[in-house]
């Protein structure tokens, strides 16, 4: 599936974009096929998957992989594969093994993105995300909008209330 490719590409492109970004992050899809975790399975291989997981994470300062997101689900043929063919049931131990199997892939992809950044990144720019709010600014906004907002918020009907708030903005 292309979701994992998109995740890795989005992180890599953000790494070199010049935007402030605390990446890289990366992800891997694993499929439990014939009792083995297969990374980045082809569509044809997924037919034999009992269970699939998508795991995303990043490398932390000590070099370990911190998992940030897990999506999991049974393969479409799981019932048949488990009960008719005797394939491995994805119990807690098996799924934990899949999470551990994902970590080396996440690490390698994150390291590749870090290398890409070294050779291709634009200079990181700083952007002010929010203006500094001062007591004077709060007081000025209160002076300008308080009475009108009090009046608008006292309107019981939703649509007229929303219209009045929109007018005030």
Language-model-detected regions and their locations in the chain:
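Polyanion-binding surfaces on beta-sheet-dominated domains and ring/shell assemblies
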Residues: 1-169
């Amino acid at each position: 599936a292309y979701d994992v490719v998109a995740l890795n590409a989005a992180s890599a492109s953000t790494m070199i974009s010049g935007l402030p970004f605390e990446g890289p992050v990366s992800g891997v899809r694993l499929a439990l096929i014939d009792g083995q975790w297969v990374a980045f399975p082809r569509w044809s291989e997924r037919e034999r998957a009992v269970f699939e997981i998508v795991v995303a994470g990043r490398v932390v300062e000590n070099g370990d992989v911190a998992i940030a997101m897990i999506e999991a689900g049974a393969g479409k043929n799981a019932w048949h594969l488990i009960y008719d063919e005797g394939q491995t049931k994805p119990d807690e131990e098996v799924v934990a093994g899949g999470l551990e199997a994902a970590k080396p892939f996440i690490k390698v992809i994150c390291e590749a993105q870090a290398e890409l950044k070294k050779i291709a990144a634009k200079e990181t720019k700083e952007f002010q995300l929010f203006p500094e709010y001062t007591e004077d600014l709060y007081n000025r906004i209160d002076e300008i909008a308080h009475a009108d907002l009090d009046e608008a918020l006292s309107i019981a009907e939703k649509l007229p209330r929303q219209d009045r708030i929109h007018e005030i903005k």
